[in-house]
UniProtKB/Swiss-Prot annotation:
This is ATP-dependent protease subunit HslV. One of its GO terms (cellular component) is HslUV protease complex. CDD domains: protease_HslV (cd01913). It is found in: Cytoplasm.
Length: 175
């Protein structure tokens, strides 16, 4: 699978993900880019799960963002509704993290759109490890990017489906 984390701290929101693509127990690729900017560069998105499914969902989310510009929550809720109810989409196996300057969301195929309350959240096979590491580092003087990178490094040390090839995207936040 993979690990994707987002950290919101110090005027930045940072999303980071590893680059490993596994097929069963075999590493097929080590430098995949699972974190990217969408929505005219105003949204960062990361995905875990089946790669083709995740790209399908990213395309759908981009269309929703075109329909509802500047409204990440609305676009995410509309995507989650489609994902849960559409005969084709509901079979897709992926999760997504998305963030803009004011909101961070986790979107699942069960129709969940979750907003984290501690400034960080993570998904994927190493998500729990990365989340715990980031939570422990949130009260330090480390920047959002430093926390995200360290949390992913810790997850990669523990999770065999996560590697140390980290891709980071960041946005300035409101407030």
């Amino acid at each position: 699978m993979t690990t994707i984390i987002t950290v919101r701290k110090g005027g930045k929101v940072v999303m980071a993900g590893d680059g490993q693509v596994s097929l069963g127990q075999t590493v097929m690729k080590g430098n995949a880019r699972k974190v990217r900017r969408i929505g005219k560069g105003e949204v960062v998105a990361g995905f875990a799960g089946a790669t083709a499914d995740a790209f399908t969902l990213l395309e759908r989310l981009e269309k929703k963002l075109e329909q509802y510009p500047g409204q990440l929550m609305r676009a995410a809720v509309e995507l989650a509704k489609d994902w849960r109810t559409d005969k084709y989409l509901r079979n897709l196996e992926a999760m997504m993290l998305v963030a803009d300057k004011s909101t961070t969301l986790a979107i699942t195929g069960n129709g969940d759109v979750l907003e984290p309350e501690h400034g960080t959240t993570a998904i994927g096979s190493g998500g729990n490890f990365a989340f715990a590491a980031a939570r422990a580092l949130m009260d330090t003087d480390k920047s959002a990017e430093e926390i995200a990178r360290r949390a992913l490094d810790i997850a990669a040390d523990i999770c065999v489906y996560t590697n140390h090839n980290i891709v980071v995207e960041s946005l300035d936040v409101e407030g």
